[in-house]
């Protein structure tokens, strides 16, 4: 139908021309509305009143199953459904009863068909509602919430027409109160809401304080905003748009509920061929978090169907990272646990003429329009014999595959279900020489484990049709697959292949190099798991792909470490300072608070002797305007000591370089307060400190338009600076790998696993404040 004809058809339903044009832009909606209007005209003629047109538009815009369109249009045109309330009930009924035939008697009862609500009943219901609120209504008059009266009347008369209820409320209120006065016409003053008491479950909005991003945490339920809040209840899979039903669906769902008891079940299914990265953290939080928020369970299932790329170290590392983020799987499973069942189902698929053995080579299947398989229609018995021959090792790799008979969303035809691989499996050894593919394994493992919500990233959307098709082809329980947007970061690469290239090029040490965004790297750098979880919560779960700035993740890190990392003092570029009038014959013991803002968290003790070390940058012989630290005629305080030092003599070497300072000291309360207090160390430990910056110079190192030479050409030469002879106070002497500290005025640091009894090694996790140049 031409656009002008459709426009005329839609305006004939009572739509404004603007609304009709907007509707035409939505191809799915316009097609369904066109069909509904055409069917209605066959009964009512070309003239359709606006009330009926409104119902038809509501039907077309909200109906998920086009098979029910004619059925519902007939109820609208016959006036059996004549209110919005009835239409909503009808749509809910067909959504909850996806299989034929519809029980019309039950349907009509649920939708109020034939129920007549008289004006007298409406009058009585409104009168009863007004009487319940009469006293308050007389006081507040027209400032009273009339919606409350209409809501109570509607609750008493479910199938009453909403417009009639509103009209009756208006009439009775006017009769009780009389016409509106000038006071009634004044706007009701807004009452400021009382500020709720602070709780642990805060919102995830960013608060900017003094130019810094302060990130607040979220509860699990607050994380699951957006589309996730619309998820189906267990057993109501058929209510999900696009879910495919068969005559067996309802029986299978009943069996599913008998097994699970209506429990929410999710799974996190990584491939054990690499290390998890920040994007996986979102998937872990979503799957485990959604299950936990709904009192459900989450499986950790290793998709170990490609023995060529799997290594034992990856299984261990993945499990460790899940635990590190604070989650405990209900059960750890493996796709290989189900190899026998998967094989039996593959045989059954062939018997049902839904799969066949194919001899096209891998290169023949690549590209956008590969040739159809000449073996697609081979006899069932022949495919059964050949598939058994595949299992027995009678074909070389690439000579035969088992393919499923379906076309996927992206146009890919007949995806491979099994292929030959003569590689021993880490769990099953040489038992198998054929292995199932992801397209075949994923949905069936979900079915076996009775997963209720199969949560995947958007790249798997093209495989949703094969997911539903395969479960239904075998008549097994079919879970719901739901896709969400990936989480990516600027200035990062997370591809396993590209990380291996970085390692091979010597740009990073290994998968856990602190400049990477793998979870093992972030842990080594000192990122707390709570910060990563908070970051994932802040990002939320949406359908759109999300690319975030690293400084937002770092803000989450600061937020956690500020409350959890005890303070210590360290000097990166030491300058010796000798106090010539030190007030004691031996070092003083100074009590330093672990957390200056909360001294109830305890203290640690550091020595303060006649020789201390300060940062070289905290002294200048010729300071520029605004410089507040140590200089001639400008004393400075030493943090936590209660003392102020003043320059007495500068000791220089043969080259003129400052080697040490001689100063005098006085009590801080014995004179004018200095302009600044600096950190220091005395009788310190020598340590190595590694200072990290971004690994790449551009936001999108993989984008050829931004980095024509490829990501390896975009490496930041200053991404790592090693300070081999830094000094740190002795309070950290017993620190263990991954212990975290705030080195005052320097940043947050974590003990690196390279540390040994002879020397500690610290990684700078983040600076105290974000560098404005990075934001």
UniProtKB/Swiss-Prot annotation:
Keywords: Acetylation, Aminoacyl-tRNA synthetase, ATP-binding, Cytoplasm, Ligase, Nucleotide-binding, Phosphoprotein, Protein biosynthesis. One of its GO terms (molecular function) is ATP binding. Its EC number is 6.1.1.18. It is an enzyme of class 6 (ligase). Signal peptide: none annotated. The modification N6-acetyllysine is found at residue 309. The modification Phosphoserine is found at residues 70, 495. Pfam families: tRNA-synt_1c, tRNA-synt_1c_C, tRNA-synt_1c_C2, tRNA_synt_1c_R1, tRNA_synt_1c_R2. ATP binds at residues 271-273, 277-283, 457, 486-487, 494-496. A motif ('HIGH' region) lies at residues 270-280. L-glutamine binds at residues 303, 438. GO terms for biological process: brain development; glutaminyl-tRNA aminoacylation; negative regulation of apoptotic signaling pathway; negative regulation of DNA-templated transcription; negative regulation of stress-activated MAPK cascade. The modification N-acetylalanine is found at residue 2. It catalyses: tRNA(Gln) + L-glutamine + ATP = L-glutaminyl-tRNA(Gln) + AMP + diphosphate. It comes from the Eukaryota. SUPFAM superfamilies: Nucleotidylyl transferase, Ribosomal protein L25-like. InterPro entries: aa-tRNA-synth_I_CS, Gln-tRNA-synth, Gln-tRNA-synth_Ib_RNA-bd_2, Gln-tRNA-synth_Ib_RNA-bd_N, Gln-tRNA-synth_Ib_RNA-bd_N_1, Gln-tRNA-synth_Ib_RNA-bd_N_2, Gln/Glu-tRNA_Ligase, Glu/Gln-tRNA-synth. Monomer. Part of a multisubunit complex that groups tRNA ligases for Arg (RARS1), Asp (DARS1), Gln (QARS1), Ile (IARS1), Leu (LARS1), Lys (KARS1), Met (MARS1) the bifunctional ligase for Glu and Pro (EPRS1) and the auxiliary subunits AIMP1/p43, AIMP2/p38 and EEF1E1/p18. Interacts with RARS1. Part of a complex composed of RARS1, QARS1 and AIMP1. Belongs to the class-I aminoacyl-tRNA synthetase family. Glutamine--tRNA ligase. Plays a critical role in brain development. PANTHER family: GLUTAMINE--TRNA LIGASE, GLUTAMINE-TRNA LIGASE. This is Glutamine--tRNA ligase. It comes from Bos taurus. The lineage of its organism: Eukaryota, Metazoa, Chordata, Craniata, Vertebrata.
